[in-house]
Amino acid sequence: MKILVLNSGSSSIKFKLFEKDEALASGLVEKIGEQNSKIELKDLKSGQKYKKELAIKDHEQGIELVNELFAQSGILHDLNELDGCGHRIVHGGPNLTKHCLVDDEILKEIDRVAHIAPLHNPAHLIGIKTMIKAAPKVPNVTVFDTAFHQSMPDYAYMYALPYEFYEKHQVRKYGFHGTSHSYVSKQAAYILGKNINEFNAISAHLGNGASVCAIENGKCVDTSMGFTPLEGLIMGTRCGDIDPAVLPFLAKELNLNPSDLDTMMNKKSGVYGICGFNDFRDIEAQIEQNNEKARLALDMFCYRLSKYIGSYFAILPRVDALIFTAGIGENDDIVRAKVCQRLAHLGFDIDLDKNAQLRNGEISKKDSKIKILIVPTEEELEIAKITTELIKNK
């Protein structure tokens, strides 16, 4: 089966084409709505790239150009040849708890919760509708970042706010990066020869956005991100957990409105807010040059991450593995070493040589009580697999 995976942003479309779990091509349409828009497609077998630079007025034109480049490359003659299209959807809200085939009711529900994820859901809807128009016979599937976390118990996802905020406004913890946490937990169970339904793990998805997830018997029981991706860990430009009273204080002191506060917390905080850098390669290079703010930022990041991992020991009856994934998780041996050494008393015994050399696989010592693994995330592949399964079973 040929499955196209789409991730539609407000001004971009990321796409990847799979056949029987093998990636054939990937690409990006960017700067949609601007004069200097561009589209690039890469044939992942030959390595050949196909590019166009022109003004792309909207997502519909972007999808038409994707179709043209596929035909030009010979990888796919027409989008109607696809067996299915899987769409990454950031937020499913309280009602869309499972991945599903698209119909009118699903589109209405994604739109209904768009106010909870205003930066993502409206763009996802445009992507789905554009694809339906471009290839009307191809089934579309929605894969929700929030779905994996729907197994959390109510005492884990509820906030101690007036209950009516939950009833009337759906204010609760939803969690994100679910597709990634689901994929790497299954991969880790396979690597360790465990049945996923009996596998307990803590998964750390560490990129510019970062979250941890407590997994019991293959299901999420808690995660660090909340109502939005702002809660939890210190991130590249996001503050993570803070005392909520800081916000009205700053609003009053600095005459800031809600939009100012939102921008400050999401785009000007995190490690960037502390040291002026959000790329950990730059932060670690600055530490080599004795930049104290860079050292502080790294220490804060690793401390918060260690605290979250440690707290999940309190809610899991047993921990089989700690999984590192995403850009920092897969590539930053300094972060992994600092966290695992801080948590050594809990049963983590990291092999520093393996940690420095490997970017995939087990990095704990043979006699480590808890296994430590690097598992590269493949969110698009997971979306393609889910899409294939739903179409086969429809």
Curated annotation (Swiss-Prot):
Keyword Mitochondrion assigned: no
Give the primary localization class. cytoplasm
Q: Which residues bind substrate?
A: R88
**Which cofactors?**
Mg(2+); Mn(2+)
Q: What keywords tag this UniProt record?
A: ATP-binding, Cytoplasm, Kinase, Magnesium, Metal-binding, Nucleotide-binding, Transferase
Active-site residues, record numbering mapped to chain: D145 (proton donor/acceptor)
Question: InterPro entries this protein is in?
Answer: Ac/propionate_kinase (IPR004372), Aliphatic_acid_kin_short-chain (IPR000890), Aliphatic_acid_kinase_CS (IPR023865), ATPase_NBD (IPR043129)
Q: Which residues bind ATP?
A: K14, H205, L206, G207, N208, G209, D279, F280, R281, G327, I328, G329, E330, N331
The record, for CDD domains, names: ASKHA_NBD_AcK_PK
The reaction(s) catalysed by this protein are: acetate + ATP = acetyl phosphate + ADP
Q: Where in the cell is it found?
A: Cytoplasm
The protein's role, per its UniProt record:
Catalyzes the formation of acetyl phosphate from acetate and ATP. Can also catalyze the reverse reaction.
Question: Into which family does the record put it?
Answer: Belongs to the acetokinase family.
Tell me what this protein is called.
Acetate kinase
Q: What species is given as this protein's source? A: Campylobacter lari (strain RM2100 / D67 / ATCC BAA-1060)
